[in-house]
UniProtKB/Swiss-Prot annotation:
It comes from Mus musculus (Mouse). GO terms for cellular component: autophagosome membrane; cytoplasmic vesicle; lysosomal membrane. Plays an essential role in autophagy. One of its GO terms (biological process) is autophagy. The gene is Tm9sf1. The chain crosses the membrane at residues 237-257, 310-330, 339-359, 373-393, 412-432, 469-489, 499-519, 535-555, 570-590. Glycans are attached at N178, N401, N559. This is Transmembrane 9 superfamily member 1.
Length: 606
């Protein structure tokens, strides 16, 4: 019995995956090791095909007219593998451990003109295939295309009908797997009449060799045999240059701001001592700057429930991002494992929902919020609802085009169950703890009942200018690394420099905090006490710059095309920018709050 075309064993696999997501059992990043004896069968699974320049546009391998068993048996997949678009199925290839095969016939085929045209179109779009041997992905192109720009113009398309598998072993374990088409001529697909059948004979060979490498992670050539480009190792100099510029920027802002602030505190405290005989109101009338608004600076903002929800979800994603990077640094992710990061991200997201509930409810109660149930609902839906809407559009496009990236109904129900049984309850539990542990808001100054009138502000202190400056500077700190991240997620790179990623992430947060403090100081100096939302928007606008960069990357740095890839790219890029807005907006707000409390605590007042 099958479910949506996949075996029931896959549906039964959902229960252990759910248990896995609850933190029971081994994580998805644990690398399995299979031990073989000479002559033992080694199963080769066919997985997916798709355009080389559209990594997220993938289809089942057997959707092409290729050698296929009479009954297709699918491999049970983990949740992360399903989310990665994997659809592994058994193949006709017969491989035995340490037994070479010179040339063996896989199958004979008679292709119709429609099937030939399907293959021609796939080859013209640079379709690649992915097989999996002992959890090692091996990739190659479906065919060969040669086009001449000289006269006479030629356009030749050929299909690779022979594959040469090269496998390396150490002891009783497989270390490396690769496929090539060396010394093989492609079978021409040109010149076929519409009523003519094309006869093909698919063959393959297997070569085994022993290696001294004991672990797959030590195999520097990687799991793809150079099929995907590797250029990540060359960006050290750019990263170091970026770090130097960022440290100079942070140091400059910190030194200048501290000097100005120290002078302000000394002047204000001196003026306070000389006018100690008068009232505070009399003193305010003779002063200007950030001190004069001390009775309004802690006035609670409008839409406080939404503000607290932003802070809660932002804190959750800060914990989630830190957790993913730390797990990568500890070696829990392996390039050979399918969907490991996907599974870990879902697990961490579900578990960190308690953080969003706690932070949001705790601060909401501190600033006088009364509708804490509504606050919890808003917090739990602030990211999940935009994510669901984005995913619905993307998944519908994949489903309409028959892509393997479209999630089956069982997986959708599993993810919904995880959110309903783990994520949302943890948000509520965190909210209850946050509400009960909240103390009154600690404001160094009392707030008057009547709000002070805010004087007209110059154009360079407007929200738009603050968002431009506050968003561009943190973005410039990560722009170099952002290219490599995009090349990994939306291209064919493999990211392994997690140490650099950790430092860049720390630099991003540090720059965001420093810029937020500087912009908040300039805003308060203009007697504008509406800093609550401004601090979130100023540095949170980095997410907008990241989305604009994604548009630039799509247009100038990639060869992506087609509705499937385009919808997925812009949908999830917009969601990524939103996540960065939440994270950096949270860092910016709490940095500004800490700074404001510091300067007003150190200010002598009646």
């Amino acid at each position: 019995m099958t479910v949506l075309g996949y075996p029931r064993s896959w549906s039964c696999h959902c229960l252990p995956v759910l248990i896995l997501l609850l933190g029971i059992g081994h994580g998805p990043w644990v690398e399995g090791v299979t031990h073989y004896k000479p002559g033992d069968p080694v199963i080769l699974y066919v997985n997916k095909v798709g355009p080389y320049h559209n990594p997220q546009e993938t289809y089942h391998y057997y959707q092409l007219p290729v050698c296929c068993p009479e009954k297709i048996r699918h491999k049970s997949l983990s949740l992360g593998e399903v989310l990665d678009g994997d659809r592994m199925a058994e193949s006709l290839y017969e491989i035995r451990f340490r037994e070479n095969v010179e040339k063996r016939i896989l199958c004979h085929m008679q292709l119709s003109s429609a099937q030939v045209e399907q293959l021609r179109q796939a080859i013209e779009e640079l379709y690649y295939f992915e097989f999996v041997v002992d959890d090692l992905p091996i990739r190659g192109f479906v065919g060969y295309m040669e086009e001449s720009g000289f006269l006479p113009h030629s356009h030749k398309i050929g299909l690779w009908t022979h594959l040469d598998f090269h496998l390396e072993f150490h002891g009783d374990r497989i270390i490396f797997a690769n496929v090539s088409v060396r010394d093989v001529k492609p079978h021409s697909l040109d010149g076929l009449r519409s009523d003519e059948l094309l006869g093909l004979t698919h063959t393959y060979s297997v070569r085994w060799s022993e290696t001294s490498v004991e672990h797959r992670s030590d195999r520097r050539r990687g799991d793809d045999g150079g099929f995907f480009p590797r250029t990540l190792e060359i960006h050290w100099l750019s990263i170091i240059n970026s770090m130097v510029l960022v440290f100079l920027l942070v140091g400059f802002v910190a030194v200048i701001l501290m000097r100005v602030l120290r002078n302000d505190l000394a002047r204000y405290n001196l003026d306070e001592e000389t006018s100690s005989g008068g009232s505070s109101d009399d003193f305010d009338q003779g002063d200007n700057g950030w001190k004069i608004i001390h009775t309004d600076v802690f006035r609670f903002p409008p839409y406080r429930g939404l503000l607290c929800a932003v802070l809660g979800v932002g804190a959750q994603f800060l914990a989630l991002g830190t957790g993913i990077i730390v797990m990568a640094l500890l070696g829990m992710f392996n390039v050979h494992r399918h969907g490991a990061i996907n599974s870990a991200a879902i697990l961490l997201y579900a578990l960190t929902c308690c953080i969003s509930g706690y932070v949001s409810s705790h601060f909401y109660r501190q600033i006088g919020g009364e509708r804490w149930v509504w606050n919890i609902i808003l917090t739990s839906s602030l990211f999940s609802v935009p994510f669901f809407l984005t995913w619905s559009v993307v998944n519908s496009v994949h489903w309409a085009n028959g892509s393997t990236q479209a999630l089956p109904a069982t997986t959708i129900l599993l993810l919904l169950t995880v959110w309903l049984l783990v994520g949302f309850p943890l948000t509520v539990i965190g909210g209850i703890f946050g509400k009960n542990n909240a103390s009154p808001f600690d404001a160094p100054c009392r707030t008057k009942n009547i709000a002070r009138e805010i004087p007209p502000q110059p154009w360079y202190k407007s929200t738009v200018i603050h968002m431009t400056v506050g968003g561009f500077l943190p973005f410039s700190a990560i722009s170099v690394e952002l290219y490599y991240i995009f090349a990994t997620v939306w291209g064919r790179e493999q990211y392994t420099l997690y140490g650099i990623l950790f430092f860049v992430f720390a630099i991003l947060l540090s720059v965001g905090a420093c810029i937020s403090i500087a912009l908040t100081y300039f805003q308060l100096s203009g007697e504008d006490y509406r800093w609550w939302w401004r601090s979130v928007l100023s540095v949170g606008s980095t997410g907008l710059f990241i989305f604009l960069y994604s548009v630039f990357y799509y247009a100038r740095r990639s060869n992506m095309s087609g509705a499937v890839q385009t919808v997925e790219f812009f949908g999830y890029s917009l969601l990524t920018g939103y996540v960065f807005f939440l994270m950096l907006g949270t860092i910016s707000f709490f940095s500004s709050l800490k700074f404001i409390r510091y300067i007003y605590v150190n200010l002598k007042m009646d």
